Each structure stands twice: as C-alpha cells, then as structure tokens.
Amino acid sequence: IDTAEKAMEAGHYFRQADVDILFLYVTTYALSSTVLPVVQKAKVPVIILNLSPGASINYEQFNNMNDRTKMTGEWLAYCSACPVPEIANVFRRSGIKFHQVTGMLHDDKECWNEVGEWIEAAKVANVMAHNNLGAMGHYYSGMLDIYTDLTLQVATFGGHIEIMEVDELSSIRKQITPQQIDKRVKDFYEIFAINDECSLHELQRAARTSAALDELVKKYRLGSLAYYYKGTGNADNEDTMSSVILGNSLLTANGIPVAGEYEIKNAQAMKIMDSFGTGGSFTEYYAMDYADDVILMGHDGPGHIKIAEGKIKVRALQVYHGKVGKGLSVEMAVKHGPVTLLSVVERAEGKLMLLVAEGESIAGPILGIGNTNSRYKFSIGARKFVTDWNSHGPAHHCAVGIGHIGSKIEKLGALLNMEVVKVC
C-alpha cells in the first residue's frame, strides 16, 4: 500500500472482512497518508510493528558497495524506525489509539512473544464480545459489593446477558431419565475422588441437576453463568439449588465458567481467564497466615477441575455456608506454581477496570471443609498484597488461573479501553 487510494481500498476491505485487530508492519519509509485511511476505515485497534530486518547494518559491507543508488535501497531496508514517529503523530492528532511493538523481524523472542500476546488478547476480546452469560436466580441479599450494572457490562465487554429463572432448571430436572442419571454418576466417579460419606442418593440428585444444567446451557448457548437462589418455600427449587455444585464444576471445566452468589462481575473475570487458557476458578479470601506469609483463598461451590492440584474431592456437607439445604461439595487446591488473580471492578465513576496480581500457589496445609482453597504467596508479601488489592475497591470475589498472564490482561484492557491495575 503506497498511495492514499490504495489505503482507502484496504480500509474498506478490512471493514468488509470484519477484522478484530490490525498489525501495521512498517517495512521502510512510508508516508502517513498511506496509513491513516486504512486505520480510519477499519475502526479497530492497531498495533504498529516497528521491526528491523536485523540487529544492525553491516556498516563495512554497506560502505563498500560503491553504488549510491544501491546504498540508498539497502539503507531504506533498515529504515522502518524512521516513519513510526510520523505515523504515531498523525494517529494521536486523529484521535486513534495505537500500540507499538519494537524489535527485530528475526531472532527476537521477546518481540514475537509480545505480538503473540496481542493476538491472544484480541481473541479473548472477540470471545467476550460474542459470549452469552446466563444470570440465573437473584443476588445474595445484603452482599452490596457484588451488585453490578448489567448494561455497563455489555457496553464494556459486548456479548449478551440472559436473565434466567431457576424454575426452568427445576422443570428440566424432572425430565431427566434414569439412564442419564446413571451415566452422569459414572462420570462423577471417573472425574472426582468421591468420599465414602457421599450417599448414592446425593450423587443421583447431583447427577440429575448436572444433566439438567447441560440442557439449559445448550438451549441458551451459554458461555458462562452466574447463579444464586435460596429456593426457600419451594421444594423443587431447593432440591435443585442444593445439588448444583458438581454439575457447575463440570461446566466450568468445559469452558463454561460458573460463578456462585450471582457474581456477574466475577463470571466475566472467570470467562476472561478461561479464554486465555489459564482456568479461572471462583475464589475469595479465607484467612491470613502471618507465620508463613501466605494468604488462604478459596470458595464454596464449583471449582475448576483442569487447574486442580490432583483429583478434586467430593464431600458431603450437612449444611452449606450461607446457602439453603445440604448436599455435595467439591474440595480442591489450585495447581502449585505461578498463578494470576483477576477482578472486574466497578468504579464509582461508572466504569469497569481490571485488577490483576501475579503470585504463586504453594504447598502446605489447607482447610478440609469441602471447599476450594489454596495457599498463595506474593512478591510484595501477604500483608501489603491484601492492603494494596483492597485499596482499589474490588468485590470480595476474584478469579484465579494458572500461569503469569498479567501482561496479556494489560493488552486486553488496552483493546477494550479499560484501565488495568497490576498490584504485583
């Protein structure tokens, strides 16, 4: 593309192709007039690739060419850095956000890792823009921090939020066959480490609900789900809601993260983490261990099977913490090694931001209470981490995934025009 006319044609082509992101590879000197129309028409994020063909010019060989025309051509091959300030200037004056990758075309791992992260971030933004998030039931009464503006969620991430009723799940549950229940119980024994205290009756209850959840997810093409419902005074709904944990754990493991307590913000965070391929399990503070300088974090309800340290245990609980009824629950720790925490934070000024921290899941004693829980260590220490994290006003839930992906989340925030704060 070396004329303004070709640039306009390219811009129309990119719009028709419905691209999510543009990579502008500056190969040599280019007039900004051959670039601006492309980006103006495409109206998508642009990454300027300021890539040199090599680490340096062979000065001796260059100066021995004895042909000024050839010398100019060879110099221009290394001239990609020259027009980048011009292009950046025009983008800024045109109100176009841009990002840069500076490095070498070949043998530059750091550079191409960065390009790869931009591609991953664009993919996740696309997933979120097309995601159907189910919101089933109602908010946990009195838990003010988790309430959110649904319109703001869709305006920021895109996608669709389907408001759903527990009654429908209870209705589907009644249609599940004995054969479906038997098959799902067998699945449970293959996937989970089931404690002897778990009765066949409870396993069958959970299996019926799990199969019904699959039907509900299929009907609404859900990519994530937030749920909570007391079910008090309605035996069918109480039966449903006291037997959802195993089924929700299976959904979470299969790319449909499920957040309890109707935590829609955290369902979004979990979907982001899962779309990056790092898991995304529902978690909150459990306790501080000042002796070992670690934080215990976890939650009741579903866990993410694919990021568990070993096989997830299933335990029978005679009472649910803050929930109606009794039934089966899962107990797991997140795989030992690097982890990333993510919270979608709703700001007082009416915007969403992404709060991120990188740490380590470490071995050690945890609470055997039939919940997910792990021990986390942070580079800034447990005390400072908690203080700094809380200072940004997140809800008390967050999503945890394996690996350090803070830089990828920062790029996602840039693509979505969201503020990103990294605590550590």
What are these regions, as identified by a protein language model?
Residues 183-276:
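Long, internal scaffold/assembly segments composed of regular secondary structure
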Residues 30-43, 234-248, 378-381:
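Short Gly/Thr/Asp-enriched flexible loops that form oxyanion-binding sites at enzyme active sites
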Residues 19-28, 47-50, 222-228:
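Periplasmic-binding protein-like
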Residues 251-368:
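C-terminal catalytic subdomain
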Residues 7-19, 35-38, 210-219:
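Short, well-structured alpha-helical segments in soluble
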Residues 37-64, 69-81, 248-261:
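Short, acidic/small-residue loops that bind anionic groups at enzyme active sites
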Residues 55-185, 191-192, 198:
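Cap/lid and interdomain-hinge subdomains that line or gate substrate/regulatory clefts
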Residues 323-424:
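Extended hydrophobic packing segments that form well-structured cores
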